[in-house]
Amino acid sequence: DFGLFQQKAKRATDQSFRVEQLSKEFFLYLGEFIKAQREGQPPSNYSWQLRIMAATRTLPGWDDVEMMWAQVGETMALLLKSLDEIYKALGELAADGHDSVEDSMGNLSNLMRRMGEAEAASSGLMHKPSNELIYWVEVNPRGERLSLNAAPLRVGPLVQKHLWNEKAAVIMASATLT
């Protein structure tokens, strides 16, 4: 039913605007937390980084950042659920012979995957850390951009699995490889 589909699309649109607004607020809270951690440090031409560890999560102000993220994460979960409902509705249309929706389904699937990955990485940084990852917040030299980062602690098994075991030949070039 087209009316039901429109309702789902409107709900997802409203939720996406809510995620956007809450994300902006989250980064404002995070920016204030970072500013407090940088207190007294001179400006630099280099990016500034704060490693997020258990001790970081006990610092004053972190609770506010974490509560703000909880709102973002909850709303993002609702949005992902709405997008999944739309994806299923598009699947029903495709099954009924409307081939024109297949591109939209592919785009929506990719969007949902990327949003899910971003939510999982951000939740790990905020309050569900993995022992296999390292987390940090980075501020660019001019201080106008914050980025959340996560990276594996042990890359050897990943390189072995995805490169050495999968490829017949591998050429790696880097200024840091010796």
Enumerate the predicted regions with their spans.
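ASCE RecA-like P-loop NTPase motor cores
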Residues: 1-178
